[in-house]
């Protein structure tokens, strides 16, 4: 028999609503909206829909700062994913989503279902997913638990992505102590769509049926959205019931069936949405609210895989591989027949109404009846207090860190062995990045590139964020995250189009944390405006704290760019001996927040590196022009580890060397100054490249050599290192640490 649910009186007097995630004032607001005390099911509906994860009640004032419009934008924020125009009637849909809390509790399933959820967001728009990326954060690889988390998260991503047949083509991983108990797992999906096929998540047309398709509903993931909206604790590790279990083979069937409906039955499909966070209640109430309609759902008709499920459990379950469709009256059988061909259930569970109410019926009784807008649109919005942390001013005034560089080659080797810098081949080789056979640039270069079939175009894509810079200065660091993403796209031959942002922060109820969120948004907005990359989708993950210890501010930037001609595709590795090496951009003694500072001081402090957005834009445009004119053989942005690491990485693939003279002192070899690019050009293109770059801070450094030796000179100083030795250290670091 099902458990007896608390009465309205018990909910109020025992403050059961607090356990469900509502504050006292929010509970009172619900009572005011309803004109009565909510029952248990209704309290559950409000608790999940008013969670930060679903309502963005703490972050909405900040999100409004983002530029979201541009001539390239076909769909901005507010739907399952954003979409940009790439010409020829085609669009690219993409979005990033976090699955942080679940991935700490149950790393394999947490990561796997994060992948599944973001794939559904993209195909719910009518787009065929063509690529996956991820952005991961872990603690140092010096404990068995850290190694376990990395191995299981990567296995979960691989297990789901490989099984469903979507290539995982790129991403980034950073290791820092602040992520030890707060790992971040952000998954990004990119899809291709014909502009005419764009769908909306809406339920309109009075009397139109609402259909449930896909897997049956179980008790997994109940209150998952609430779980993701509170600070974590050691006890929270026991909350495995809030973590869903995924089935990629079911998802593959669901994907193909939904795309068939969109392609062949668009005239009878009114709307479609994934059942993601907060499950059925979220998808159904949002679809009705967006259309200005109401909804009546019959819980008895919801496919269930467990006995005696209550309406509360069915509405809040986050069981995976489920979609909600609204179709025109009289066409249910057509839709059911299509889904049956894929072996999937498609069941009518309700209909659109005209009263703007959200009515739930079970065993012939009304068990919930609330205004639909109150759930989906009218959550309270909080303008949290904001306060500059004491550390910020201290960092501004701190004496600049000066690295110990007595043994330059020794430092070089140490840096290449740091897991944040070291080769991630051991990780990405677990992913099938060639499935679908359209991957033009595989993991390991600045950006991944996937061809657009039937055209000469390709899509460049990347995820980026150096959270250490944001810890020092969230505004500058936020701008750098966008700039670096754009750099990676440009270095690969693409024109940056737009971003999706995964905003991972600590507890917003702490004024110092909310200050970080505000400032990071300011930096991201400024860079997006300057570089013409509007924010078209995203995700907010707050409360990434465990027992009071939080993460660095980590707004992950997922960016997509257009490679207009396959001939423009460029990679970071040197191609031929004799090619001429150039450095674009100025190198300064900037080590704060750098991999070198972390290595030598064991901590991060000081002023973040400077970023001039006008200079950044100018250099990116010049480099992209040079690439499009066929003048560039290789191109690599300078990021973690600065020039020294970028130069070494450029030699590794072909086993070449380099003989260069740099315009800065050798103790600045690992400075992380911004807006810099390492470029090689064929000798016959040198004059044209130099002319294009005339009057800019562009330096001819030397040439690519046939031997496996890197020689770096500045005036009388010189260092020499063997490519093979550096590569061995770089490639072996992570496999060694994960043993």
Curated annotation (Swiss-Prot):
Compartment(s) of residence: Cytoplasm
GO cellular component: cytoplasm
UniProt key word Protein transport: no
UniProt main location, coarse: cytoplasm
Enzyme Commission numbers on file: 6.3.5.3
MF annotations from Gene Ontology: ATP binding; magnesium ion binding; phosphoribosylformylglycinamidine synthase activity
GO biological process, one term: 'de novo' IMP biosynthetic process
Keyword check for ATP-binding: yes
Pfam families (UniProt xref): AIRS, AIRS_C, FGAR-AT_linker
Positions that bind Mg(2+) 2: 121, 274
Residue numbers binding Mg(2+) 1: 97, 539
Catalysis: reaction(s): N(2)-formyl-N(1)-(5-phospho-beta-D-ribosyl)glycinamide + L-glutamine + ATP + H2O = 2-formamido-N(1)-(5-O-phospho-beta-D-ribosyl)acetamidine + L-glutamate + ADP + phosphate + H(+)
CDD domains the UniProt entry points to: PurL_repeat1, PurL_repeat2
Pathway(s) this gene product operates in, as recorded in its UniProt entry: Purine metabolism; IMP biosynthesis via de novo pathway; 5-amino-1-(5-phospho-D-ribosyl)imidazole from N(2)-formyl-N(1)-(5-phospho-D-ribosyl)glycinamide: step 1/2
Record's function text: Part of the phosphoribosylformylglycinamidine synthase complex involved in the purines biosynthetic pathway. Catalyzes the ATP-dependent conversion of formylglycinamide ribonucleotide (FGAR) and glutamine to yield formylglycinamidine ribonucleotide (FGAM) and glutamate. The FGAM synthase complex is composed of three subunits. PurQ produces an ammonia molecule by converting glutamine to glutamate. PurL transfers the ammonia molecule to FGAR to form FGAM in an ATP-dependent manner.
Family from the record: Belongs to the FGAMS family.
HAMAP family linked to this entry: PurL_2
NCBIfam families for the chain: FGAM_synth_II (TIGR01736), PRK01213.1 (NF002290)
UniProt name for this protein: Phosphoribosylformylglycinamidine synthase subunit PurL
Organism: Listeria monocytogenes serotype 4a (strain HCC23)
């Amino acid at each position: 028999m099902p458990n007896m649910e608390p009465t309205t009186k018990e909910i109020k007097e025992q403050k059961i609503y607090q356990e469900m995630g509502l504050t006292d004032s929010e509970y009172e607001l619900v009572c005011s909206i309803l004109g009565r005390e909510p029952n248990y099911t209704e309290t559950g509906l409000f608790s999940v829909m008013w969670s930060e994860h679903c309502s963005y009640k703490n972050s909405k004032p900040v999100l409004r700062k983002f530029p979201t419009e541009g001539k390239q934008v076909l769909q901005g924020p507010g739907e399952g994913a954003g979409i940009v125009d790439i010409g020829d009637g085609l669009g690219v849909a993409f979005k990033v989503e976090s699955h942080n809390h679940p991935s700490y509790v149950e790393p394999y399933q947490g990561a796997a279902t994060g992948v599944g959820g973001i794939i559904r967001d993209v195909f719910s728009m009518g787009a065929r997913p063509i690529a996956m990326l991820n952005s991961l954060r872990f603690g140092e690889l010096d404990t068995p638990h850290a190694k376990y988390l990395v191995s299981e998260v990567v296995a979960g991503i691989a297990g789901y992505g490989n099984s469903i047949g979507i290539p995982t083509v790129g991403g980034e991983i950073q290791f820092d102590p602040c992520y030890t108990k707060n790992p971040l797992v952000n998954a990004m999906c990119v899809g291709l769509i014909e502009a005419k096929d764009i769908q909306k998540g809406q339920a309109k047309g009075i009397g139109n049926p609402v259909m449930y398709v896909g897997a049956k509903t179980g008790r997994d993931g109940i209150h998952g959205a609430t779980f993701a909206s509170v600070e974590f604790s050691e006890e929270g590790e026991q909350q495995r019931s809030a973590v869903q279990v995924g089935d990629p083979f079911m998802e593959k069937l669901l994907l193909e069936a939904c795309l068939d409906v969109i392609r062949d039955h668009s005239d009878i499909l009114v709307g479609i949405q994934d059942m993601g966070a907060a499950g059925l209640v979220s998808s159904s109430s949002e679809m009705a609210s967006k259309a200005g309609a109401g909804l009546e759902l019959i819980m008895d008709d919801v496919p269930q895989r467990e006995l005696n499920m209550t309406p509360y459990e069915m509405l809040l379950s986050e069981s995976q591989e489920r979609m909600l469709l609204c179709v025109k009256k009289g066409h249910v059988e057509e839709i059911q027949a299509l889904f049956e061909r894929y072996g999937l259930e498609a069941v009518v569970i309700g209909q659109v109404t005209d009263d703007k109410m959200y009515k739930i019926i079970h065993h012939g009784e009304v068990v919930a009846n609330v205004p639909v807008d109150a759930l989906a649109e009218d959550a309270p919005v909080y303008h949290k207090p904001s306060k500059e942390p004491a550390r910020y001013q201290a960092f501004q005034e701190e004496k600049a860190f000066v690295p110990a560089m007595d043994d330059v080659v020794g430092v070089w080797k140490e840096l290449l062995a740091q897991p944040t810098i070291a080769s991630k081949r051991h990780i990405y080789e677990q992913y099938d990045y060639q499935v679908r056979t359209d991957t033009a640039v595989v993991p390991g270069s600045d950006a991944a590139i996937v061809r657009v079939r039937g055209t000469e175009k390709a899509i460049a894509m990347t995820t980026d964020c150096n959270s250490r810079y944001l810890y020092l200065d969230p505004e500058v660091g936020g701008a750098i995250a966008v700039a670096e993403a754009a750099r990676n796209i440009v270095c690969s031959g693409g024109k940056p189009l737009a971003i999706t942002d995964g905003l991972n922060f600590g507890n917003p109820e702490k004024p110092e944390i909310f200050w970080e969120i505000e400032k990071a948004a300011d930096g991201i907005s400024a860079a997006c405006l300057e570089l013409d990359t509007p924010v078209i989708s995203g995700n907010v993950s707050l409360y990434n704290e465990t027992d009071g210890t939080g993460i660095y501010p980590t707004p992950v930037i997922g960016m997509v760019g257009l490679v207009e001609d396959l001939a423009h595709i460029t990679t970071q590795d040197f191609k031929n001996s004799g090619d001429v090496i150039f450095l674009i951009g100025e190198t300064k003694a900037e080590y704060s927040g750098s991999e070198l500072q972390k290595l030598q001081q064991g901590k991060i402090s000081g002023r973040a590196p400077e970023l001039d957005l006008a200079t950044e834009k100018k250099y990116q445009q010049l480099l992209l022009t040079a690439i499009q004119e066929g003048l560039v053989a290789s191109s690599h942005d300078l990021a973690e580890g600065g020039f020294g690491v970028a130069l070494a990485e450029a030699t590794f693939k072909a086993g070449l060397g380099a003989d260069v003279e740099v315009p800065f002192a050798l103790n600045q070899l690992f400075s992380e100054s911004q807006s810099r690019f390492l470029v090689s050009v064929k000798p016959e293109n040198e004059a044209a490249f130099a002319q294009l770059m005339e009057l800019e801070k562009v330096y001819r450094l030397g040439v690519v050599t046939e031997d496996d030796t890197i020689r770096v000179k500045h005036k009388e100083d010189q260092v020499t290192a063997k490519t093979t030795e550096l590569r061995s250290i770089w490639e072996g670091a992570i496999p060694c640490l994960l043993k």
